[in-house]
């Protein structure tokens, strides 16, 4: 049995339950022309984000991670929801947010990993093709992100 089979993801477009620990905050960042920036790592397209540090808010975590990994400034950040991750007896949340791209600076080395990540702006309506999530929860999250972005940004 693969490790992935032991992990269950469920998408909730709700406020986070207080007792549920948050292990990551990731975001979908939109440009003014309805594109989304994706991080490219080892030939795979991914969202950007990471672990909250030093009692950061979700917004602070997302802004820091986008600077560290892609050197992109964000603004107009909205909470989207969370993925409930059930891994054996462990339960935790992966928070998802949306944001507008404020400024894109030259690529640089991520201080946390020592890597320089690729980045690409892709049409928002093609994001599922690039991320290629196998699970329903990830695809539901993308649908909700696109809807919230249309309501708030476009």
Task: Enumerate the predicted regions with their spans.
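Class I (Rossmann-like) S-adenosyl-L-methionine-dependent methyltransferase catalytic domain
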Residues: 11-12, 16, 84-86, 143, ...
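A short, compositionally biased N-terminal segment around positions ~18-40 that is enriched
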Residues: 19-32, 143-148
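Short, contiguous, helix-prone interaction/anchoring segments in small proteins
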Residues: 25-46
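Acidic, metal-coordinating catalytic segment for phosphate/diphosphate chemistry
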Residues: 1-26
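Charged phosphate-binding loop/patch that engages nucleotide di/tri-phosphates or the phosphate backbone
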Residues: 133-154
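Unchanged
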Residues: 52-75, 80-136
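Short glycine-enriched loop/turn motifs at secondary-structure junctions
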Residues: 21, 45-46, 110-115
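A short local loop/turn or secondary-structure capping micro-motif enriched for an aromatic residue
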Residues: 45-48, 55
């Amino acid at each position: 049995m693969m490790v992935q089979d032991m992990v269950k993801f469920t998408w909730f477009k709700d406020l986070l339950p207080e007792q549920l620990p948050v292990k990551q905050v990731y975001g979908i960042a939109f440009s003014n022309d309805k594109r989304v920036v994706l991080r490219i790592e080892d030939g795979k397209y991914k969202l950007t984000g990471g672990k909250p540090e030093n009692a950061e808010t979700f917004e602070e975590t997302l802004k820091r991670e986008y600077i560290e990994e892609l050197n992109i400034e964000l603004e107009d950040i909205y909470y989207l929801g969370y993925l409930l991750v059930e891994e054996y007896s462990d339960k935790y949340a992966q928070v998802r947010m949306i944001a507008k791209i404020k400024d894109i600076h030259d690529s640089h080395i991520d201080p946390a990993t020592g890597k320089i990540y690729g980045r690409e702006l892709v049409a928002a309506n093609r994001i599922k093709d690039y991320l290629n999530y196998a699970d329903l929860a990830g695809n539901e999250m993308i649908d909700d992100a696109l809807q919230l972005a249309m309501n708030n940004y476009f």
